[in-house]
């Protein structure tokens, strides 16, 4: 039976500081490290094993995956990293404090930028300190200046179909460590969630989400492992 486990990275430094992170690379906090280790221990205690892993090019997701695999005694597993599993790009909001933005432009505008399905934030300025044009990991990648959730889905799902689906069709057990919005993209597809509803789906940090799949990859069951 194909099994897909999704996990959002543990708490990052900018999660703690309530800042828009997007594609900017920040590491886990001590609490985030503990979350990742606890997730790995939970998976190990429940007897989970994996054949293949996928993650983004961002440190917080990569480190979470490594911490989980360490608890599973499975650091040797093949891991594929790809920018298409990155977090949604928050454009000109990158690095800004969410509450300070609410104070400046109002809660409704910030809600539109954060939670609308197809309205992106303002683009990242050419002179922003958060530009990634010189970041070697994105060599050859056309880096977006901003993204809506719809844009994020537009890169995540083709990657899922091309790279993760073939592994699942071989009945491999797959672990994906990624981000709130890239995981929303996968959950929307797997659980057939409407555009209007997916923006309200909250995905907590460091909590394994288990998808038990039929051979045709239809969903047999979906649950948070901590609840079983």
Each model region followed by its residue ranges:
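Short, hydrophobic/glycine-enriched beta-strand segments
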Residues: 3-9
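A conserved hydrophobic position in a structured secondary element of the catalytic/binding core
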Residues: 7, 105, 178
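Short glycine/proline- and acidic residue-enriched helix-loop micro-motifs
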Residues: 109-151
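Loop-to-helix element that buttresses phosphate recognition and phosphoryl-transfer chemistry
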Residues: 11-71, 142-160, 200, 208
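Active-site-adjacent alpha-helix immediately C-terminal to a catalytic or transition-state-stabilizing loop
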Residues: 4, 62, 76, 150-219
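Phosphate-coordination/substrate-recognition cap region in phosphate-metabolizing enzymes
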Residues: 40-127, 188-212, 216
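Short, hydrophobic secondary-structure boundary micro-motifs
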Residues: 16, 111-114, 221-222
